[in-house]
């Protein structure tokens, strides 16, 4: 009983921490395939109007991302934040080297301020680890375009046996001491980064499975298993779309949910979401703000960012509006959740499925009866044909006694007349 209480209390608040940062997991069999992938996605952003620098992180196992968030807000689970920001070697090394030094060094801050060509600029790092490959990409970019403008450095582990380290440098004309400092530091630390990637992969795989086994409450497992970035094709969704903002409702594990997505370059840093629900009160209709049950940001390797928020539809037949806001420009986009009754649609779908099943069974029975009838008719016709073939010679061949044939043959040899044919009984009667 006490064990259940000890587990349930931290899970409800999303603070299921291990007592220590996970060390090398040697007693756990990692049955990883080529498709298994660990993704660390860390970025630094700074608005030109202030001196505050924010850094964020994404930690994902293959396509099941269990943490989206930044250092200031609790997104998804504190457990994921704890692992991402404190325990993993590659993340901690690059995070400390880039972000912590930026906060402390005035010279680097001045250099970084020169990047502020627009409202906000970024330094973006992507770390991909797997048992068979490692991939680290470092990019500096600004809001004026999706493609990197100043620096793009890529490290790729080409051959695991001899640890061939392939580097792609694209400085685009920038002669920056800090750029070369990053390059030389990561180059000298290539073996450490390779080993750290493999170690981090094993650790994350182990602790993710262990955490899922401990998180017994419904909402905890729901958050861990849900990823709106990967939409199942066989899942029926009812949505309203905008160029940048969309609002959809569907069922997830038997629960009615709605997800609002804000799509665009950099929205994970400067975007915000808000969902309002129309309620009736004694003074008329009012709009009430609805808190998200789960939120997050997604930064793909290529393409636009996605900021999403999920709510449970406890009161379905009401009006929900999602507002996607660009905090830099103040631009807002509002979309309304489709007015669709999922229960009614499910009942109609069930009844239609029953009708389709009955129709299928009826057609199958008709086809089976037709097949049996055709086989019977074919068998009867075959038997009738065989009978006719067997009786045909008996109907057309005349039967003569052997003695008469011999006498007639003898008479013909000696020039005598053959015996007269016997008249039939009918002719004799006439």
Swiss-Prot record:
Positions annotated with a glycan in the UniProt record: 31, 142, 162, 293
Lumenal side: 1-362
Intervals, Cytoplasmic compartment: 384-430
Domain of life, per lineage: Viruses
Cellular compartments annotated: Host endoplasmic reticulum membrane
Record flagged with keyword Glycoprotein: yes
GO cellular component: host cell endoplasmic reticulum membrane; membrane
Record keywords: Glycoprotein, Host endoplasmic reticulum, Host membrane, Host-virus interaction, Membrane, Transmembrane, Transmembrane helix, Viral immunoevasion
Residues annotated as transmembrane: 363-383
Membrane topology: Single-pass type I membrane protein
Modifications after synthesis and translation: N-glycosylated.
KW Transmembrane helix (keyword) present: yes
Function: Binds to MHC class I molecules in the endoplasmic reticulum and targets them from the Golgi directly to the lysosomes. Once in the lysosomes both proteins are degraded. In consequence, surface class I molecules are down-regulated and infected cells are masked for immune recognition by cytotoxic T lymphocytes.
Family classification: Belongs to the herpesviridae U21 family.
This protein's domain notes: The ER-lumenal domain associates with class I MHC molecules and is responsible for lysosomal sorting.
Protein name: U21 glycoprotein
Organism: Human herpesvirus 7 (strain JI) (HHV-7)
Gene encoding the protein: U21
């Amino acid at each position: 009983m006490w064990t259940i209480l000890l587990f349930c209390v931290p899970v409800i608040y999303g603070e299921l921490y291990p007592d220590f940062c996970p060390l090398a997991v040697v007693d756990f069999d990692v049955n990883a395939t080529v498709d298994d992938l660990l993704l660390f996605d860390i970025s630094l952003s700074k608005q030109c109007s202030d001196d505050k620098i924010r850094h964020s992180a994404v930690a994902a196992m293959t396509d099941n991302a269990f943490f989206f968030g930044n250092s200031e807000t609790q997104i998804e689970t504190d457990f994921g934040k704890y692992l991402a920001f404190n325990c993993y070697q590659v993340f901690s090394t690059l995070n400390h080297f880039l972000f912590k030094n930026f906060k402390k060094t005035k010279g680097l801050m001045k250099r970084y301020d020169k990047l502020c060509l627009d409202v906000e600029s970024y330094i973006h790092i992507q770390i991909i680890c797997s048992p068979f490959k490692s991939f680290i990409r470092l990019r500096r970019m600004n809001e004026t375009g999706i493609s990197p403008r100043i620096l793009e450095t890529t490290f790729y582990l080409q051959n695991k046996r001899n640890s061939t380290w392939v580097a792609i440098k694209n400085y685009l004309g920038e002669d920056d001491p800090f750029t070369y400092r990053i390059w030389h530091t990561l180059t000298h630390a290539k073996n450490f980064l390779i080993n750290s990637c493999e170690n981090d992969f094993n650790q994350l795989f182990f602790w993710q499975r262990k955490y899922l086994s401990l998180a017994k409450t419904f909402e905890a497992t729901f958050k861990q298993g849900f990823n709106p970035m990967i939409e199942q094709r066989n899942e029926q969704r009812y949505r309203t779309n905008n160029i940048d903002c969309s609002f959809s409702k569907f069922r997830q594990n038997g629960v009615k949910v709605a997800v609002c997505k804000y799509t665009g370059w950099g929205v994970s840093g400067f975007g915000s979401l808000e969902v309002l629900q129309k309620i009736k009160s004694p003074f008329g209709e009012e709009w009430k703000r609805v808190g998200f049950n789960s939120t997050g940001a997604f930064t793909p390797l290529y393409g636009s960012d996605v900021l999403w928020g999920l709510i449970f539809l406890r009161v379905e037949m009401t009006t929900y509006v999602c507002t996607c806001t660009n905090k830099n420009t103040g631009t807002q986009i509002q979309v309304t959740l489709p007015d669709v009754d999922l229960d009614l649609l499910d009942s109609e779908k069930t009844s239609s499925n029953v009708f389709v099943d009955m129709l299928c069974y009826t057609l199958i029975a008709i086809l089976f009866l037709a097949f049996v009838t055709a086989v019977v008719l074919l068998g009867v016709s075959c038997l009738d044909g065989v009978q006719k073939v067997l009786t045909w010679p008996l109907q057309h061949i005349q039967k003569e006694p052997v003695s008469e044939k011999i006498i007639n043959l003898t008479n013909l040899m000696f020039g005598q007349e053959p015996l007269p044919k016997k008249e039939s009984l009918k002719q004799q009667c006439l």
